Amino acid sequence: MGHTFNRPDEAAMLRILERHPHSPEGAILRLAWLEGLSRSEITELRWDQVDFEGKAIQLPDRAVPLEPSTEACLRERHVRCALRDPHVVISERSKKPMPPESISRLSRLALDSEGQKVNLMDLRHDFVIRQLQTHDWPYVARVSGMAVSTLRDAFSPCLLYT
């Protein structure tokens, strides 16, 4: 049985990202949509895992290449926030790591501003689909942290319609 994926509108996503060049919302959405991170990975992401020189995010199970938009956002956030807390996504108010519920709420508000009825997992799935459109299964398995067999089972059907 195939999966159904709820995909965001690319133009709407780009407008949202343009409005949030380096805010927590901008970082959260870029990490999910452009880098394929899950909410828990976003919550736990620390500055020592962001390799600006190597242009990658080093997660425990994989390295994800930094997209230029994400790199620019994170560089600005690093200047503003890195000395306050080792976590990449912190609350602008409390200056403490943002809990998962707050990450979901901020992303939901930003996505709603453009009528996008998607969530962070949908953005991660869209990342995987876009990667599969331009890369082979082993590469996508490496950057997504998913097994090739899992990718094939879940995403093969949707590639027929992209």
What are these regions (language model features)?
Residues 50-52, 117, 136-156:
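Short, polar N-cap/turn motifs at the start of nucleic acid-interacting alpha helices
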Residues 28-29, 40-45, 140:
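Alpha-helix N-cap/helix-start motif at helix boundaries, enriched for small hydrophobics
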Residues 161-162:
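Conserved small/polar residues in nucleotide/adenosyl-binding loops
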Residues 35, 40, 44-74:
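Conserved tyrosine-mediated DNA breakage-rejoining catalytic core shared by Y-recombinases
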Residues 6-39:
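Basic, Lys/Arg- and aromatic-enriched nucleic-acid-binding interface segment
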Residues 67-116:
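Active-site/catalytic core of tyrosine-dependent DNA strand-transfer enzymes
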Residues 104-144:
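Short, basic (Lys/Arg/His-rich) helix/loop patches that form interaction surfaces
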Residues 1-13, 60-69, 82-86:
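DNA breakage-rejoining catalytic core of tyrosine-based enzymes
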